[in-house]
Amino acid sequence: MKKISNSLNQKIKKFIQIIFKLIYGNINHDIKKISSEKIKISETKILKKISNEGYKVCEISKGRIYTDFVENVAVIEKHTILEPFSYQTYDGKYLPYSENTCVKKGTPRIKKYFKGNILNLTQGASGHSNYFHWLFDILPKIKIFSELHDLSSIDYFYLDNLKPYQKNILKLMGLENINIISANKHRHIQADKIFATEHPWYFKGLILEEVNNMPDWIIEWLNEKFLKFANNFNAGENIYIDRSESSFKHCQFKNENEISRFLLNKGFVKYKVGNLSFEDQIFLFNNAKVIFGAHGAAFANLIFCKKDTKVIEVKPEYHPNKISKKIAKINKLDLSLIETKELQNKENGDIELDINILNNLL
């Protein structure tokens, strides 16, 4: 019965896709079909990729955007997907733009037209609420755009509905008056003008590996832009980042109670960083002398640390993300990265840390 139900659902989806293709047309990836009259592409001169090339920013008259809100975003001129400005991944791996879902399935959502100018900032699930990707993916797109265009010309950001911390950060940037179009509610949009930038650092391969090639300017700009907003409070100088608040099960200590008792006896103060305001997080990391914790989004705040801050980060050896090394190199931090063996039973955590190793590093 379940197989019949799944088969029926697939047939219904196929039928819906056919109907929407009749309405909005097929999507191709043939750049020869792009109208040079409706699209303008400019390139940054100061901000550079890791390859030392500038970033491209496009401006499309009557352009469209389609997203599945998970792994695909298509920036479209008439019926052609634009390669550098679209985004498509599968299982954490970047795909050729010819494999964007809209090339195969079309744009099976009712199109909503917006009068005015839209800057596309959405890139799928990773950019919706994750603190790290908000700082290192979404905000740099705004910076890239602002090198070539005036932000006051933008009427809308195309994103998901903002979390409180995201609203706060945009307010700190003086961008609180720009309207937000929910990419979840409006999966298919068109506007008088669509603007889109290339991704700040992800152009190929696995995202957890490519993050290690992030250009220096992103880290330096975030520090310069936001450090001044640090909110002074009675924070400990030796801090333990508690990840138990995270909805993710990876990078969690199996022997959390043992580690916690050991560190509290050493004078550490435990913080659930996600419960702090952005301004408090800035101060917490800038004020710290020693930081310990399991790998997670909170370590994005290393961008605010002072030179020579001692950082001890722990992660499973199979986890490839080493962005902390990049930040530590630029900010001249004293980073110790502990990589633990894979556990057979990860039900109550995937990291078991030998206290003796930690004690030797403190």
Predicted regions and their residues:
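The feature primarily captures lumenal catalytic ectodomains
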Residues: 1-362
